[in-house]
Amino acid sequence: MRKEGKFIIIGRPGSGKSTCIMLLLEKLRASGTKVGGIRTPELRERGIRKGFAVEDILTGQSDIFASTDFREGPSVSKYRVSVERFESIAIPALRRALEECEVVVIDEIGKMELLSRNFLEVVRDIWESEIISVGTAPLVRIEEIEKLKSSSEVIIIERGDSERISNYLFNRISDLLRVSRSSHRPSPRGTLSFL
């Protein structure tokens, strides 16, 4: 059953999911909304993608967790993944966001991130809470993501849609926060959204 305030944006690589998230973060911060969670920006060297970092949206703390240069760890595509590095940033960032923020952002929930069972557990905790959340996920079917999608508003993004979708999400989230704040609750706990 769909829960109010949970959003998942799905799309192919390069479709603009992360760009949409960055635009949304700018809008939320400018409006005074406290937002936390994680981003997983790609790392490029001379135009070639070499890996991914994980970044705590609230504190800015980050670390590389997937790289073509790593020699150990599970493989996803051409990258080796350090689950330990990922968890050292992602788990406290998401727990902190759940406790301290009005909106949680998770960019993204994909194969590399789901190598961490602890990550999946905290994502489920966020999903079961009432906090407004926005996440991104790949277009391919992944069982764990399908379960989350069943209780979310799913938005399919195509190249060129980032601005339009970020505006839509900002307006939806602003409306939800307005209702929550007017009912004198400290924050809308329990809603997860994926972009």
Curated annotation (Swiss-Prot):
Q: Which residues bind ATP?
A: 11-18, 103-110
Record's keyword terms, sorted: ATP-binding, Hydrolase, Nucleotide-binding
Q: List the disulfide bonds.
A: none
**EC class (word):** hydrolase
The GO molecular function terms of this record are: ATP binding; ATP hydrolysis activity
What's the catalysed reaction? a ribonucleoside 5'-triphosphate + H2O = a ribonucleoside 5'-diphosphate + phosphate + H(+)
This one is known as Nucleoside-triphosphatase THEP1
